[in-house]
Amino acid sequence: AGTLGGARYEKGIGPDEDLVFVVDLVAVSASPMYCNEATIPKGTRDGKPTEVKMPVEAPVDDVTTTVLLEGDGPKATKKSYLTVDYVGVSCASGQQFDSSWDREEPITIAMSDATPTDTAFSVIPGWTKGLDGQKQGSVVQIDIPFEDGYGTAGSPPSIGTSDPLVFVVQILKVSDEAPPSPTTTT
């Protein structure tokens, strides 16, 4: 048997035959099931990761933290202020959406039980869950389900609706004290 014009006569399907498929829908998810390979542009400042090992399956239930390099400084708590460098990658697209390395400046964050200030920013829940207990000097990868990221709304245009996120975070400083406010000069 052979093919003629794309028809497969040996299977009994002619070139002008209608086909009907029966499909069992097993599950529906607003969030992607798999992560795309990461594309990280090279940074201009030392230390920026050029590769991020994306999880094969998108994070669904829990925040997962992988220690890439363990520091030996104080441990972060939910009451801590952390100074960090980071790169964030969309699980759905594999594209970098943010990087403090690219802005040429680390940021200071207030963990969930610390009070945000004009110099220490609040963060998504996945950051607090992923950084709690990590040591100053560590580099960690945090895989975050969409519920602990930007939720069903996302953060357009870079973070889609229900998009799981992957961050690589370098913890430069852990402190129990809020950073000082910038001084103004007149």
Task: Write out the residue ranges for each language-model feature.
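Cross-family detector of peptidyl-prolyl cis-trans isomerase
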Residues: 1-186
